[in-house]
A protein has these predicted regions:
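A short hydrophobic beta-strand segment most commonly corresponding to one strand
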Residues: 135-137, 194-219
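Active-site glycine-rich loop that binds ribose-phosphate moieties when present
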Residues: 156-186
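Generic recognition of flexible, low-complexity loop/linker segments
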Residues: 174, 190-191, 257-258
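Transition-metal
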Residues: 1-156, 216-257
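Short, well-ordered, mixed-charge alpha-helical segments that flank or form enzyme active sites
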Residues: 123-124, 145-150, 156-161, 187-188, ...
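Conserved metal-binding segment of the jelly-roll/cupin
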Residues: 115-118, 178-197, 204-206
Length: 258
């Protein structure tokens, strides 16, 4: 008799980021363990800058591992390989195949998140043999002064955006949102976005890590913090129109405010 599947719990995986903080450990009580090449385990404390907790990921690297039940120790990739449509349903399986189609994370944004953009499915498939990356952010907590940058506050040209990235003035044309707990924002492929300080986010996205970093708030000029930029590679996939405000839904913390 075939064993019955059950609700799975997965072991979270920490991702260190220069803009991260300690909220994932302190507030969400995450227990992160890292292993070195020799198999030695280290528990990450709240002194480590952790920007992301990968809760459910089928990415080929750092795949989520089942923590409970008789399938404990198996990865989500192995579950999909074995149980196919029993995991996601026949329609979803027929469309996406053996890769679990969602990547679910928690984000602790304690400093400036780079200005970035993601490709759509068509561009990602043609250029990188990958899914694109549409994502939804749910604001679990927002400290006073926290900001999200989503799209532009007016239409800009590709040349103006390119020049502003090099001049360090890109924030002048970004649409600014002062988020509150419970807000939801849909970040479509092509939407330039970033965030700054004091945000705890639940992120649900397509199963892709296709991120093009466009501007990194000056970190690129410091050898200690420099990360690769992809401005030339991504300049033609950006949506340069003003941000569509219907992509942002205010949460209950706004009350009756307009």
């Amino acid at each position: 008799m075939e064993k019955k599947l059950y609700p799975f719990k997965f072991i979270p995986v920490a991702s260190r980021r220069p803009w991260g903080g300690s909220a994932l450990v302190k507030e969400l009580r995450k227990n992160f363990v890292e292993c070195d090449e020799e198999g030695n385990e280290t528990v990450l404390g709240d002194d480590v800058l952790i920007g992301e907790s990968w809760e459910l990921a089928d990415m080929g690297i750092e795949d989520s591992v089942v923590a409970n039940g008789w399938l404990a120790g198996n990865t989500i990739s192995e579950l999909m390989e074995t149980y196919l449509e029993r995991i996601v349903g026949e329609d979803v399986y027929n469309h996406y195949g053996r890769q679990f189609p969602l990547l679910i994370k928690f984000l602790d944004i304690n400093d400036k998140l780079s200005v970035q953009v993601h490709p759509d499915d068509e561009v990602a498939a043609e250029r990188y043999d990958s899914l694109g990356k549409a994502e939804i952010w749910y604001v679990m907590d927002a400290k006073p002064g926290a900001k999200m940058y989503c799209g532009f506050n007016r239409e800009v040209s590709a040349q103006e955006f390119y020049d502003r990235c090099h001049a360090g003035t890109v924030d002048e044309v970004l649409n600014v949102i002062e988020p509150r707990k419970g807000d939801v924002i849909f970040i479509t492929p092509g939407t330039v976005h970033a965030a700054d300080g004091g945000l705890l986010i639940a992120e649900i996205q397509e199963s892709s890590d296709m991120t093009f970093r466009l501007y990194d708030w000056g970190r690129e000029f410091d050898p200690q913090t420099a990360r690769p930029l992809h401005l030339e590679e991504a300049i033609d996939i950006i949506d340069y129109r003003p941000f569509d405000q219907t992509q942002f839904r205010k949460g209950p913390a706004w009350g009756s405010e307009e």
